[in-house]
Amino acid sequence: HLMHGRPLSYIEQIKDLKNIEYITIHLEIEENIQNILNKIKEYGFKGSLAIKPNTDINLLVPYLDIIDRILIMTVEPGLGGQPFLENSPNRIKEIKKLIKDKNIELEVDGGINNQTINKVKDVDISVVGSYITTSDNPAQRINDLLV
């Protein structure tokens, strides 16, 4: 997940690495998204777009035939430990409608913990950070998420 406004130079630097499957760029970047997604595919990676909480989901539409995954940010990106944004489940539902006939995975990142995990149960991947890493008992926190 490249949290950078101009990710192409980073992609060029990692293009020969073999242990990377997906490259995620933000929909809100300064560079031409289509060109970057084409480069990602050209280098043999799967392409993924991250979308911030307040970005119009319809901006994803032009890229739905080329991307393999959408990362829905459930907090404003950039700072760990933020609370889960309560409108996120509605955004997930709306994005699921957009991709209903597509083979695109959905991922969420931000504010995921034992209280919010059930609100995102309809996605393929949930990224959990601070809830686990700030705990004195990370194994218990992981188990709490699996219930």
Regions found by a protein language model. Give the residues of each.
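N-terminal active-site wall of soluble small-molecule enzyme domains
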Residues: 1-39
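Generic structural signal for well-ordered alpha-helices
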Residues: 11, 33-37, 57-60, 89-96, ...
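Glycine-rich phosphate-binding active-site loops on the catalytic face of alpha/beta enzymes
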Residues: 23-31, 71-82, 123-142
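Alpha-helix-loop-beta-strand connector modules within alpha/beta enzyme cores
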Residues: 39-48, 88-110, 145-147
